[in-house]
């Protein structure tokens, strides 16, 4: 066990310091915003320092472990630790939350509560990624939903209450299945509950029972990821939420579902995952084409970007179902890549709304001349979304593509068919991305504003946009920068997966 509680400090620091926001002067919006931004920067620096000096990339085992008895009656532990699978999402969480705080600078109504909720969400997300106890994972998963619901219901469009209610109904429904799975696995075959990830990874279950557990976890993670048909909350939520909240949803929240699918379904329930992986690949391929086909019909700019996110999540599902090193590495890279791309697209959509007060594409047009900086940034990021070579999306999708082709589990013809469907999805992506750019920036000026003059992106907005763009370019040019974090862990997961399958067959 680690002698110094680095991870505990990283998890509790945002919410503890964030609670002091309410002690600041009520009208001191600027002081409070700088205070929140400083907390996020300090947290990101602390996380980076801890991982740089106390984490070994070539070690696939859990590191920086902390294990404290919490509730004696239930034998419940505060158990934290990180490995190659969780380090990337934790760093992504810190980076996106810091920029989302800067993006939320224009928020003035109930600003104290808004920024506190962002910091509470920050703690919940890092806690979910670093939990090594199944019940602690569930508690962090649920805790994170509270600030998200409040952010959705209090700040946003006219239908924000409807979208927030829809979000909480979907996620709470999924959480019921998550809790059943957690209790079922923890209480199975033992007088005392066993909730330690390391212990559960070596636990064996009857196939029928393992399938039941798997389905419960799959439903919970399918809502968050989202996987069709559990996706309908996402376009409504993104369409109404404030764009800084959208950055957190697209950049981090969706990735929690993918993380849980690998961490729990694949690592703890390998035999059921082997049975369900062909279905995951089929659903992933359908999702890519379905969302890419639906996106062009969305006139709401943020809803169109939301459907593009659903399409990109299909590649993550296929990578997880490919049962290959290459495919799983591609899925993890897509988690990080889309975190940057999705957050950047929603940020730029929000900044354009701040200027023209329009969200529907059929009301826009001719914005390239008055807003050249916004036009340039959104064009580059749309290219990243459609997986232009040299940008991060291309490498991630290519790895998933090769992962399914080289997988040893599937026959040749099904692999060719899935690859063909993925290729169709890749062809459909430029249609909705480029048509979005055409409707926004080219053609006639459809917004009739007398003596119009719009301010282009300012220094703050350019800083946020460029900060999100640089990692996208960096990963596209040198993907090993991210892959080196997870490659050893992915190899260990795949090796343990196939060892468990072979061992089960021998029994």
UniProtKB/Swiss-Prot annotation:
UniProt keyword annotation of Lipoprotein present: no
Protein name as annotated: NAD(P)H-quinone oxidoreductase chain 4, chloroplastic
Bilayer topology annotation: Multi-pass membrane protein
A GO MF term: NADH dehydrogenase (ubiquinone) activity
Domain of life, per lineage: Eukaryota
InterPro entries in alphabetical order: NADH_Q_OxRdtase_chain4 (IPR022997), NADH_Q_OxRdtase_chainM/4 (IPR010227), NADH_UbQ_OxRdtase (IPR003918), ND/Mrp_TM (IPR001750)
One CC-aspect GO term: chloroplast thylakoid membrane
Annotated Pfam families: Proton_antipo_M
Keywords: Chloroplast, Membrane, NAD, NADP, Plastid, Plastoquinone, Quinone, Thylakoid, Translocase, Transmembrane, Transmembrane helix
Origin organism lineage: Eukaryota, Viridiplantae, Streptophyta, Embryophyta, Tracheophyta
Species annotation: Oenothera elata subsp. hookeri
BP terms from Gene Ontology: ATP synthesis coupled electron transport; electron transport coupled proton transport
Enzyme Commission code(s) on record: 7.1.1.-
Major site of localization recorded for this protein: plastid
Family: Belongs to the complex I subunit 4 family.
Transmembrane segments: 4-24, 37-57, 87-107, 111-131, 134-154, 167-187, 208-228, 242-262, 272-292, 305-325, 330-350, 386-406, 416-436, 462-482, 483-503
Catalytic function, reaction form: a plastoquinone + NADH + (n+1) H(+)(in) = a plastoquinol + NAD(+) + n H(+)(out); a plastoquinone + NADPH + (n+1) H(+)(in) = a plastoquinol + NADP(+) + n H(+)(out)
Location(s) in or outside the cell: Plastid, Chloroplast thylakoid membrane
């Amino acid at each position: 066990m680690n002698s110094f509680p680095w991870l505990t400090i990283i998890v509790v620091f945002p919410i503890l310091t964030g609670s002091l926001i309410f002690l600041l002067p009520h009208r001191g919006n600027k002081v409070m915003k700088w205070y929140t931004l400083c907390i996020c920067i300090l947290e990101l620096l602390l996380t980076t320092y801890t991982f740089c000096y106390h984490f070994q990339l070539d070690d696939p085992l859990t590191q920086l472990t902390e294990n404290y008895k919490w509730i004696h009656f239930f034998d419940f532990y505060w158990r934290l630790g990180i490995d190659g699978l969780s380090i990337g999402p934790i760093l992504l969480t810190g980076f996106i939350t810091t920029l989302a705080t800067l993006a939320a600078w224009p928020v003035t109504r109930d600003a104290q509560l808004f920024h506190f909720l962002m910091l509470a969400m920050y703690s919940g997300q890092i806690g979910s990624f670093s939990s090594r106890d199944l019940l602690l994972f569930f508690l962090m998963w649920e805790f994170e939903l509270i600030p998200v619901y409040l952010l959705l219901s209090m700040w946003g469009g006219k239908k924000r209450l409807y979208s927030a209610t829809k979000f909480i109904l979907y996620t709470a429904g999924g959480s019921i299945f998550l809790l059943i799975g957690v209790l079922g696995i923890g209480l199975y075959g033992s007088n005392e509950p066993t909730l330690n990830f390391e212990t559960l990874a070596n636990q064996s279950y009857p196939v029928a029972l393992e399938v039941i557990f798997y389905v419960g976890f799959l439903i919970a993670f399918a809502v968050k990821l989202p996987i069709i048909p559990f996706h309908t909350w996402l376009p409504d939520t993104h369409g109404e939420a404030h764009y800084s909240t959208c950055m957190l949803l697209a950049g981090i929240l969706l990735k929690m579902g993918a993380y849980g699918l690998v961490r729990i379904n694949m690592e703890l329930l390998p035999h059921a995952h082997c049975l369900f992986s062909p279905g995951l690949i089929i659903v992933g391929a359908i999702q890519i084409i379905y969302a890419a086909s639906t996106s062009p019909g969305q006139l709401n700019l943020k809803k169109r970007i939301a459907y593009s996110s659903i399409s990109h999540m299909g590649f993550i599902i296929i990578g997880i179902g490919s049962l290959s090193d290459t495919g799983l590495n591609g899925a993890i890279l897509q988690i990080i890549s889309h975190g940057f791309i999705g957050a950047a697209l929603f940020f730029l959509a929000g900044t354009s709304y701040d200027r023209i007060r329009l969200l529907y594409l059929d009301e826009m047009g001719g914005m390239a001349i008055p807003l050249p900086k916004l036009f340039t940034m959104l064009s580059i990021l749309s290219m990243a979304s459609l997986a232009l070579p040299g940008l991060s999306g291309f490498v991630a999708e290519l790895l998933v593509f090769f992962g399914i082709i080289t997988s040893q589990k599937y026959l040749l013809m099904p692999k060719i068919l899935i690859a063909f469907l993925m290729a169709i999805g890749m062809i459909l992506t430029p249609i909705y991305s480029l048509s979005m750019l055409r409707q926004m920036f080219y053609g006639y000026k459809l917004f009739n504003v007398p003596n119009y003059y719009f301010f282009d992106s300012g220094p703050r907005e350019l800083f946020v946009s460029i900060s999100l763009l640089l990692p996208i370019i960096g990963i596209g040019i040198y993907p090993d920068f991210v892959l080196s974090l997870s490659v050893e862990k992915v190899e260990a997961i795949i090796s343990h997966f196939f060892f468990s399958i072979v061992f089960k067959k021998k029994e």
